[in-house]
Amino acid sequence: MLRQDGADGRSLADYVAPGDYGFDSPAGMFAISVHETHPAGCDCPACSMEYDSLLNRSLRLTLAEAASGWLDAELEKQLPNGSPVKIVKPAAGYASCPDHSLKRDILALLPDGDQLDIRLTESCAMIPDASICGLVFAHPAASYPEIRRLPAEALDAYAALRGFSPEDARLFLSHLR
């Protein structure tokens, strides 16, 4: 995982839960996807409006976020009452987890992940766009550390650990330079 540059130097790896937290795993992964019901189009009266595609996309994005909210609630139910543990779900490609290529790993490692039918573009944009994938951490100090800029040495070391080619390093990490 990438680590912030500077005094705090926080990383999501700092929030891997110790075994005594009561979870089966010290960290987790998730993926959510909402597909169109009529991807080729439909000729029913409700689908003939000009704004149908915008409405459809808006609904799918809202459903994906609602599913993520449901997952939050389900995970929090697993915590004992009064637990100081916080649960964070950083999505791959966002400021806490800025490497979009982690989506490949998450989708490959999830049991039955292929049944979600999420496809990735060369730059790891998700199709359908109403898809979310990320990591799950449970820890009392859990937060979303923002990683916006890193020194070249840190990026080069991370690229080497991930086994990136120079092209992949440019594609997935250049925004952090």
Description of each model-found segment:
Residues S25-F30, L59, C133, R162:
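Structural beta-strand/beta-sheet cores of well-ordered domains, especially the beta-sheet scaffolds
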Residues G6, D24-P26, S53, R57, ...:
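Conserved structured core elements
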Residues L12, A40-D43, L55, L71, ...:
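Generic structural signal of hydrophobic/aromatic residues within well-ordered alpha-helices
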Residues E76-L161, P166-S174:
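Compositionally biased, low-complexity/repeat regions
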Residues S33, D43-E76, Y144-P145, Y158:
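Conserved mixed alpha/beta catalytic, RNA-binding, or beta-rich assembly cores of soluble enzyme
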Residues M1-S53, I87:
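Active-site loops and adjacent core secondary-structure elements that bind or stabilize anionic groups
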